[in-house]
Amino acid sequence: FLLQVPLCAAHLLFVFAKVRIPSEPGSVRDKVLRIDMGGTLALLCAVAALVAALACGDADGPRLLVYLWLAGAVIGAGVFVWLETRVAAEPLMPTQILARRMPACVSLACGLVSLCQFGVLYHVPLYFLAVQGTSTVQAGAYLVPNVLAASVCSLVSGRLVSRTGSYRATVLLSGLLTVLGALSMCFWRRQATPAWAYWLTMPWVGAGFGSTLTVTLVALVLSVDPMEVAPASGVTYLFRAEGSLLGESCTPSLFQRSLA
């Protein structure tokens, strides 16, 4: 964890020294008041209640507590939608953009592929530690092909779309890679799976993740007006964040049940 400190410090210094964004007119207080605090709080409560319900479902506590948390998640989500559609002047999730087919599909794709990717990143080391009995270094090393594939395929897919002028085939291929990569992990066996098979199956989910994020962002930018690029991109990042959170919070229950 300490290795991240100098990297984050270098990133902070670089942004502080090089990034120059013209400031808009108005005081700091006026800019802070523009933030959708109500929507943010409602979304936070909904996600926290959902995570609590999943955590209680894994424990031996009363089932009523699980249902109460789920009800709280539904209520929080309902309040969030109401605030975004009826109250917020600058909503966290602009519903008029999300109501269109392309932004909605892009947001859903980003959320689902993030769920899959972060589920893999969270549980693959846990599998090698708990099931295979490897060291922490070996368990973490198995993630290297996934991360490298995500970075490389993100760049390659962007170049491919730039040369061909079409993103449909690349999006379909990215989704196929993600599905095949996740399915190949289902055939891992403690004694029967050789080491080379782990290395061979690890990159594909990362490859699909990296290329999907890049290509869908291009598709989104081309489908909205220039003035809507920022809020539309914000919606996709919201779904990506929620997908990554659910990937790390929902999948542990399935993982624990499979080990049991």
Name every feature range the model reports, one short phrase each:
Residues 1-38:
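Helix-loop-helix hairpins in multi-pass membrane proteins, especially solute transporters
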Residues 48, 155-159, 245, 249:
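Residue-level hotspots within transmembrane alpha-helices of multi-pass secondary transporters
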Residues 5-12, 77, 151, 179-180:
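Small-residue-rich packing faces within the transmembrane alpha-helices of Major Facilitator Superfamily
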Residues 3, 31, 35-38, 109, ...:
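Hydrophobic alpha-helical segments of secondary membrane carriers
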Residues 10, 217-218, 222, 235-260:
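Hydrophobic transmembrane architecture of multi-pass small-molecule transporters
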Residues 44-66, 80-87:
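Phenylalanine-glycine-rich, low-complexity intrinsically disordered regions
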Residues 1, 54-57, 128-129, 160-162, ...:
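Interfacial helix-cap and linker-helix signal at transmembrane-aqueous boundaries
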